[in-house]
Amino acid sequence: MKKDLVIFGAGGLGREILFQMQVNKKFLEEYHILGFVDDTPDLLDKNVNGFKVIGNSNWLEQYPAVINTVICLGNAQHRKMVAERLSKNKNIVFTTFIADDVRIPEEVAFGKGCIFCFSCIITVNISIGEFAVFNSDCTVGHDSRIGNYVTLYPSVNISGNVNIGDCSEIGVGTNVIQCRNIGNEVIIGAGSVVITDIPSKCTAVGIPAKPIKFH
């Protein structure tokens, strides 16, 4: 019997993940997609890409049976808030989704609720926290450590022995050279090249990437 599953977030990432689920035969053999859950009032009961928005977070918090959930929110802080809130309902199982063409060794350790989109390559001896999102065409090199709630936007390349702290977001097309540390709650602007360590709670942009503001 298939497991019921909802996609939290009917925005861009949620719709992309729906598509990637629909073309993943192995995933569909295990899961039955019920629809979307979204906190946007205007979307409730509407159809989004062929699936209904069946409820909001309040509805899901009170769901009375086991239900698998993939949180599809690109913003790391929003994803963390939703995950912490939904964790109160022990019926919710936070599911990891791995697209069918992702390359990831069995020994790579990753936490619950992660997303690995089309064409990602995760190499060896890597540790990944909970609820991390790897958008399409990202690569992560050997011995890297990716924290909880990290977002890698499309085409990010992480070299070996890189550490990325919790709730950091790495912008589209960013490259990070080997043995660099990126702190917690960091935003790296699109197209940046990280060649030095980046401190926590800042926005860094450019080639090379440098902090432009702290938050």
Indicate residue ranges for each PLM-predicted region.
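Short active-site oxyanion
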Residues: 4-5, 32-34, 66-70, 184
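Conserved Rossmann-like nucleotide-cofactor binding loop
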Residues: 13, 42, 210
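Short helix-capping segments at alpha-helix termini
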Residues: 25-30, 88-92
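NAD(P)-binding Rossmann-fold cofactor-contacting core
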Residues: 26-46
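Phosphate-bearing ligand-interacting subdomains
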Residues: 41-103
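Structural signal for interior beta-strand "rungs" in well-ordered beta-sheet cores
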Residues: 96-205, 209-212
